[in-house]
Curated annotation (Swiss-Prot):
Entry GO MF terms: structural constituent of ribosome
Protein name in UniProt: Small ribosomal subunit protein uS2
UniProt-listed PROSITE patterns: RIBOSOMAL_S2_1 (PS00962)
Classification via Pfam families: Ribosomal_S2 (PF00318)
GO cellular component: cytosolic small ribosomal subunit
Organism name: Clostridium acetobutylicum (strain ATCC 824 / DSM 792 / JCM 1419 / IAM 19013 / LMG 5710 / NBRC 13948 / NRRL B-527 / VKM B-1787 / 2291 / W)
Gene that produces this protein: rpsB
Family: Belongs to the universal ribosomal protein uS2 family.
Keywords in alphabetical order: Ribonucleoprotein, Ribosomal protein
Length: 233
């Protein structure tokens, strides 16, 4: 029994690919047909690939490993944040800072700075500082939250997989994962290179509903895996 139905995928518009002139020939095996200058993705293959990705993510989660969600394009930002939080995971949805995985010690100093600013706000330090200084500190905090808010509790060594929306846009995240041997699961549209991804989910990465639907399935897999881990304890 599949974790997702063709009907759900159709309703969310997962089958709509890019214009035929903007395609990667390596995606040919996942294309069903062409309609009005747009490639239509073969949803039977998408169902199969979602099942494979779901099982893999569930296993990673069962082992107690974490999954990092990455999606910085506008259509993905909300789903990436909300679904990763629902699954108790980490996310990057604003900007991938170089070294987020490969130079995590430097990133950790920025996270410590963010935590320090939060503490200053909570313990009333901001109330006794000059107004100008507080404005500067608040702006810095806001910027840090945008870029690092989703990974404040992340331990780099415990990341077991990356879930990515649009591997073309998130190529830096994928190359860092590759260096560290971290498997990548991704929503791959008709203009992307599937060879960059370990678990390809062929689908529309530009429609909010399509991204939300697939991202929610990844979150479900994590939750199911964690429950299995709890049952095993």
């Amino acid at each position: 029994m599949s974790v997702i139905s063709m009907k759900q995928l159709l309703e969310a518009g997962v089958h709509f690919g890019h214009q035929t002139r903007r395609w990667n020939p390596k995606m040919a095996p996942y294309i069903f047909t062409e309609r009005n200058g747009i490639y239509i993705i073969d949803l039977q293959k998408t169902v199969k690939k979602i099942d494979e990705a779901y099982n893999f993510i569930r296993e990673v989660s069962e082992q107690g490993k974490d999954i990092l969600f990455v999606g910085t394009k506008k259509q993905a930002q909300e789903a990436i944040a909300e679904e990763s939080v629902r699954a108790g995971m980490h996310f990057v949805n604003n900007r991938w800072l170089g070294g987020m995985l490969t130079n995590f010690n430097t990133i950790k100093t920025r996270i410590a700075k963010l935590n320090g600013l939060k503490k200053m706000e909570e313990d009333g330090t901001f109330d006794v500082l000059p107004k100008k200084e507080v404005i500067i500190l608040r702006n810095e905090e806001e910027k840090l939250v945008k870029n690092l808010g989703g990974i404040v509790n992340m331990t780099q060594s415990n990341i077991g997989a990356l879930f990515v929306v649009d591997p073309r846009k998130e190529k830096n995240a994928i190359s860092e994962a590759k260096i560290l041997g971290i498997p990548v699961v991704a929503i791959v549209d008709t203009n992307c290179d599937p060879d960059e991804v370990d678990y390809v989910i062929p689908g529309n990465d530009d429609a909010i509903r399509a991204v939300r639907l697939i991202t929610s399935k990844i979150a479900d897999a994590i939750i199911e895996g964690r429950q299995g881990e709890q049952l095993a304890e």
